[in-house]
UniProtKB/Swiss-Prot annotation:
Superkingdom field: Bacteria
Entry's EC annotation: 2.3.2.6
Gene Ontology biological-process entries: protein catabolic process
Stated name of the protein: Leucyl/phenylalanyl-tRNA--protein transferase
EC supergroup of this enzyme: transferase
Assigned protein family: Belongs to the L/F-transferase family.
Organism encoding this protein: Cereibacter sphaeroides (strain KD131 / KCTC 12085) (Rhodobacter sphaeroides)
Principal localisation: cytoplasm
HAMAP family xref list: Leu_Phe_trans
SUPFAM superfamilies: Acyl-CoA N-acyltransferases (Nat)
Reactions mediated catalytically: N-terminal L-lysyl-[protein] + L-leucyl-tRNA(Leu) = N-terminal L-leucyl-L-lysyl-[protein] + tRNA(Leu) + H(+); N-terminal L-arginyl-[protein] + L-leucyl-tRNA(Leu) = N-terminal L-leucyl-L-arginyl-[protein] + tRNA(Leu) + H(+); L-phenylalanyl-tRNA(Phe) + an N-terminal L-alpha-aminoacyl-[protein] = an N-terminal L-phenylalanyl-L-alpha-aminoacyl-[protein] + tRNA(Phe)
GO MF annotation terms: leucyl-tRNA--protein transferase activity
GO-annotated cellular components: cytoplasm
Disulfide partners: none
Length: 214
């Protein structure tokens, strides 16, 4: 029997079950479904902005935007020697973006895209998919602005899928699968907005709000 066609709706159903897709490589057409025993998450009130990163944010001449060029952000995340983003995954996330369930946050130097992150939203959960950096600290800046936005929008779960040393240094932790599924169930029971009404994120405010919550 042929497996069901992979569609954005099927992808959202998988996220609701705590499963996410990956390919072995850019050229591998097969999609693998992942449900790790241990899951990386960012507690939204424990993101760590170091003094040096705070100075970088306050003094930066970069511009931060959201959903300005989702496809370019995903392409930039895939622009590395090894990537799990194959053409099928790229297409699916672009379609999810068109449906309002996938979002990007971009960091620009002038008109040049120098950093960013993208992910999927469902209920009060944000599933971080990938990020990239073409300037020192650009991905850290993207995360700082992203977490500030998630807090303001009412999100309660930021799923990073896996825990890396880079994410751990910024406050991410690893939890057991059972704990993750409980948090996911709670997050799916509510609603949040990636573009909350009246939200404004200038650099000084992002640093100040983080210091009040972390």
């Amino acid at each position: 029997m042929r497996p069901p066609a992979l569609t954005p709706r099927l992808l959202l159903r998988a996220y609701a079950l705590g499963i996410f897709p990956m390919a072995e490589s850019r050229d591998d057409p097969e999609i693998h479904w992942i449900d790790p025993r241990h899951r990386g998450i960012f507690p939204l009130d424990e993101f760590h902005i170091s003094r040096s990163l705070a100075r970088r944010i306050r003094r930066m001449d970069w511009r931060v935007g959201v959903n300005e060029d989702f496809a370019a952000t995903v392409e930039a995340c895939a622009d590395r020697e090894e990537t799990w983003i194959n053409p099928t995954i790229f297409r699916l996330y672009v379609e999810l973006h068109a449906l309002g369930h996938a979002h990007s946050l971009e960091v620009r130097e002038g008109e040049t895209l120098v950093g960013g992150v993208y992910g999927v939203t469902l209920g009060r959960a944000f599933f971080g998919e990938s990020m990239f950096s073409r300037r020192t600290d650009a991905s850290k800046v993207a995360l700082a602005f992203l977490i500030d936005r998630l807090r303001a929008g009412g999100f309660t779960l930021f799923d990073t899928q896996f825990l890396t040393p880079h994410l751990a240094s910024l406050g991410a932790i690893e939890i057991r699968r059972s704990d993750y599924h409980q948090r996911l169930t709670e997050a799916l029971a509510g609603n949040a907005s990636f573009t909350p009404e009246g939200y404004w994120a200038d650099p000084a405010s992002v640093v100040q709000r983080n210091s009040q919550t972390s």
